């Protein structure tokens, strides 16, 4: 099998670079074009601009329906909703550090940023986040389009990030297209203009992250998008549905075959058979009938059903339109239906957690400089919670049966409609206190 340049560019590993030259940056940008095209194609599928939209018909008189189906968006949104529909929470024995981390994350809209990262990774196979300090000296992080980033790792077993390149187009008021390039290293950030295949340095600034301020979030070991392996099946389904639509339109505009008589227009002129969709044969057998294509509807629908099932099966996303996926399933049955999604999401969680810990490490590095402290990023623990459909009645009955057997905190944590167990316990305690006060007041009045 031929090894494509794009496969290498999904994760670039080079020997340690003492000097990052302009020639190296330009070469990496040039070699990144195939990988950039792959990502942009996947993003077009997410927007339901599938390849079927590019199909042409040589005969303009034949129908050319171009029906695309949003499987790509469905697959990505299903996984992201299941994976991060409930925001990640954090816990730590170091409450002071946890408070600083939470404040930083709130300032950066971390919940929304995580969703963006998860969607980007689901589509492209990986996502990138850039860390920086804003004009108010606040620590910031933001997801970046993966097609605009080149991250270079060393070729050791640890695969550490050596440097990263972000390149993107900007447009001047004179409609002149200019490409800007930003280089991120362990010590500084360098800004360039990129024009006529040449880099011109504009400025550079130091940073205080003690590492390259870029975080990599992999979707899986192969850095594949969630629907990338089933693109050919999506294309086949689009083609089958489009061809079916064409066939029905052909049937609606079927040709009338007239035999045994020479047809003329009302003014005795030759009839325009093409415009009138008529075939005329001057043989001895007089008859008139429509010429239609014999469609094996049953076989065609079975074929499309198989494609639909295979798309769900090989992307591991649950088919919510399955008649067996009803609202009365038990918790065990729901988990069984979601087994495939859970396998994939388990990998997603492991990879995403690795990225989160690098983000936290970079945040803590800056906090330690600001506070002159030596806090450990490993004291922060991310907690993931699946956003799965539940049988609330079943869970409530189980929780009722555990009252008095396990702690109230454990019972409340089982209920999907209780978001903050600690706050709920405080409300319950306050209600009990008010009830007791009212009882005592009533007794005194008697």
What is the predicted function of each stretch?
Residues 128-222:
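Extended, regular secondary-structure scaffolds
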Residues 1-6, 233-245, 249-252, 256, ...:
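Glycine- and charge-rich intrinsically disordered segments
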Residues 119, 290-301, 342-349, 401:
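Short, charged/polar micro-motifs that form catalytic or ligand-binding hotspots
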Residues 266-268, 279, 306-446:
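C-terminal helix-loop subdomains that flank or include functional centers
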Residues 18, 22, 28, 32, ...:
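Extended hydrophobic-aromatic, low-complexity segments
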Residues 1-141:
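Extended, helix-rich architectural segments
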Residues 202-333:
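Extended, charged amphipathic alpha-helical segments
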């Amino acid at each position: 099998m031929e090894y494509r340049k794009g496969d290498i560019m999904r994760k670039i590993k080079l020997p340690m670079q003492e000097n990052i030259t302009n020639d190296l940056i330009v070469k990496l940008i040039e070699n990144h074009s195939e990988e950039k095209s792959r990502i942009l194609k996947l993003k077009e599928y997410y927007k339901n601009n599938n390849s079927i939209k590019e199909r042409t018909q040589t005969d303009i008189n034949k129908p050319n329906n171009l029906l695309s189906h949003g499987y790509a968006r469905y697959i990505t949104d299903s996984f992201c909703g299941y994976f991060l529909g409930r925001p990640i929470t954090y816990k730590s024995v170091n409450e002071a550090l946890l408070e600083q981390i939470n404040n930083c994350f709130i300032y950066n809209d971390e919940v929304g940023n995580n969703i963006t990262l998860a969607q980007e990774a689901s589509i492209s196979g990986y996502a990138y986040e850039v860390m920086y300090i804003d004009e108010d000296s606040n620590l910031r992080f933001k997801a970046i389009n993966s097609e605009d980033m080149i991250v270079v790792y060393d070729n050791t077993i640890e695969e550490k990030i050596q440097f990263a390149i972000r390149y993107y187009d900007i447009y001047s008021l004179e409609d002149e297209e200019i490409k800007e390039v930003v280089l991120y290293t362990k010590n500084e950030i360098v800004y360039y203009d990129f024009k006529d295949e040449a880099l011109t340095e504009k400025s550079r600034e130091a940073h205080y992250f003690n590492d390259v301020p870029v975080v990599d979030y992999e979707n899986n070991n192969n850095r594949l998008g969630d629907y990338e392996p089933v693109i050919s099946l999506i294309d086949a389904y689009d083609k089958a549905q489009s061809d079916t639509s064409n066939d029905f339109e052909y049937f609606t505009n079927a040709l009338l075959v007239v035999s045994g008589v020479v047809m003329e227009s009302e003014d005795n002129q030759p009839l325009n058979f093409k415009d009138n969709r008529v075939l005329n044969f001057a043989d001895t057998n007089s008859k008139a009938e429509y010429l239609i294509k014999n469609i094996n509807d049953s076989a065609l629908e079975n074929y499309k059903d198989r494609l639909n099932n295979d798309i769900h099966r090989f992307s591991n996303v649950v088919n919510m339109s399955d008649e067996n996926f009803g609202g009365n399933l038990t918790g065990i049955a729901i988990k069984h239906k979601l087994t495939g999604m859970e396998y994939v999401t388990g990998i997603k969680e492991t990879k995403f957690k690795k990225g989160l810990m690098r983000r936290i490490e970079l945040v803590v590095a800056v906090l330690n400089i600001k506070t002159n402290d030596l806090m450990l990023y490993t004291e922060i623990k991310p907690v993931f919670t699946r956003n799965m459909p539940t049988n609330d009645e079943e869970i409530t009955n189980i929780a009722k049966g555990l009252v008095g057997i396990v702690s109230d905190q454990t019972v409340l944590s089982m209920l999907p409609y209780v978001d903050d167990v600690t706050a709920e316990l405080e409300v319950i305690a306050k209600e009990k206190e008010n009830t007791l006060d009212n009882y005592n007041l009533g007794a005194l009045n008697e």
